[in-house]
């Protein structure tokens, strides 16, 4: 959840409410689709074919998530000057820069306003943007809320369509796999085989252990090295499975 929500808000620049809405819809469909996947398997495919189809869809979905596209872009306008906002890093290590020509300044945007990182405290607390602009040349030390404008350009041509395609593939994959994998495990044993309970115990331990390790590893790679690494690892994990 954390990786996906951060991916939506920091890479594609969805608002927090919009990102939570996308995640909620995704989570709801992940839980609902196994009902449809089970019905299709019972009537047409059989459990084994459904599991194979689900696994292929999950691998495709997670690898598709690794195609980031350009992501959203933000621009900052202060008075007559326009800057492109450049972001380096992810999560808590995310650093923002305002770039205009050869000028590149680290900034911080809060509800109070836009601050130039490293500015003098007295200037950073100033309430008059014009007065602050006179304190230092170039980027003002502090511009209060209302004295600047941030515009967001979303990656609707490539990145977002690929994102929703990937989520759709994952949802369909879970629908086929989750509803039928238990049936396949159960079919490995005769009805009264004493090993049956042990087999299901191993199965569920593997699921929970894999979920724990995958969450930690994918989140670490995604936040530390890049979104594509986190989602790509999930794809490799599904492929190996």
Predicted regions: what they are:
Residues 24-42, 178, 209-214, 239:
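Central cavity-lining transmembrane alpha-helices of secondary-active solute carriers
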Residues 2-20, 186:
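Short amphipathic helix-loop junctions that connect adjacent transmembrane helices
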Residues 54-158:
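C-terminal ends and interior cores of transmembrane alpha-helices
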Residues 50-51, 163:
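Primarily marks hydrophobic transmembrane alpha-helices of the MFS/SLC 12-helix fold
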Residues 176-190:
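Intracellular juxtamembrane helix-capping segments at the cytosolic ends
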Residues 164, 228-241:
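Symmetry-related core transmembrane helices of the 12-TM Major Facilitator Superfamily/SLC fold
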Residues 18-19, 53, 192-206:
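Cytoplasmic loop-to-transmembrane helix junctions
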Residues 8-9, 40-44, 217-226:
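Interfacial helix-cap and linker-helix signal at transmembrane-aqueous boundaries
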